[in-house]
Amino acid sequence: MIKTILFGACGKMGRVIGKALIDAVDIELVGAIDPYFKGEKYEKIIGTDKISLEVLGSIEELKEDFDVAVDFTNAEAAYQNIKKILQMGKRMVVGTTGLTQEMINEFKDLAVKNNTAILIAPNFALGAVLMIQLAKQVVKYFPDVEIIELHHNEKADAPSGTAILTAEILSEEMKKHNLTHKDATKVEKLPGSRGGKLDSINIHSVRLPGLVAHQEIIFGGLGQTLSIRHDALSRECYIPGVLMAIREIIKREGFFYGLESFLNREEA
């Protein structure tokens, strides 16, 4: 059994992931951490009778040993959580977004220094990861590309981590093949109307109630367009990816960014 603890256990994502960890036959949830729900019964919060667990306020209150920590909190809390876990020499799976490059570089160093492993993934939906992998093949033939990402109106950051990762991967692929994206726009009548830009790739963010998490990658060519789109219809779509990450990270050492790091394990 892989003994696991969960930071942000009582948040919207945390409740979904917590239930999945409890239901998994090879994973044991030994700690639910969420300072806003400290002292409450976790089984009542997520609606299950398969476990009896009191919500803890911090990692310092944990008495059980564990193998992997999972974090779905916010960037500020995750930064502290990740440092503590890596310094303990434990492995970590992180779904929290908004982490800066400076933070990520620090995590890389800590993972190596403490002979442990960490995966940070902007998106755990397998469909979203495959969308990016497909787009990586398409951009070689259609270098004129833009990204539209759409999320619920409670999402705090824009653009999404998935959109940024997509643009980074596509931009790297374009550079590898000496390709460029042409944009003739010289004047924005409304500032920002062409979206944000990562290298030559424009990213457009939409925030509306009723949305969950969606992304469309649009490629344009002579007389044609090609779109690749992923729609997350509920938070349950992230469960298979999170479980895969936990099962894989236990075998690894070092730093990994993006769930595709583990999808390609057979080629590694």
Swiss-Prot record:
Binding annotation for NAD(+): G8, A9, C10, G11, K12, M13, G95, T96, T97, A121, P122, N123, F124
Main location (coarse class): cytoplasm
Biological process annotations from GO: diaminopimelate biosynthetic process; lysine biosynthetic process via diaminopimelate
Associated pathway: Amino-acid biosynthesis; L-lysine biosynthesis via DAP pathway; (S)-tetrahydrodipicolinate from L-aspartate: step 4/4
Assigned keywords, A-Z: Amino-acid biosynthesis, Cytoplasm, Diaminopimelate biosynthesis, Lysine biosynthesis, NAD, NADP, Oxidoreductase
Name of the top EC class for this enzyme: oxidoreductase
Listed PROSITE patterns: DAPB (PS01298)
InterPro entries registered for this protein in UniProt: DapB_C, DapB_N, DapB_N_CS, DHDPR_bac, NAD(P)-bd_dom_sf
Keyword Transmembrane helix: no
Catalytic activity: (S)-2,3,4,5-tetrahydrodipicolinate + NAD(+) + H2O = (2S,4S)-4-hydroxy-2,3,4,5-tetrahydrodipicolinate + NADH + H(+); (S)-2,3,4,5-tetrahydrodipicolinate + NADP(+) + H2O = (2S,4S)-4-hydroxy-2,3,4,5-tetrahydrodipicolinate + NADPH + H(+)
Keyword Amino-acid biosynthesis: yes
Domain of life assignment: Bacteria
Catalytic residues of the enzyme: H151 (proton donor/acceptor), K155 (proton donor)
Residues that hold (S)-2,3,4,5-tetrahydrodipicolinate according to the record: H152, G161, T162
Function: Catalyzes the conversion of 4-hydroxy-tetrahydrodipicolinate (HTPA) to tetrahydrodipicolinate.
Stated family: Belongs to the DapB family.
Protein name: 4-hydroxy-tetrahydrodipicolinate reductase
Species of the source: Dictyoglomus thermophilum (strain ATCC 35947 / DSM 3960 / H-6-12)
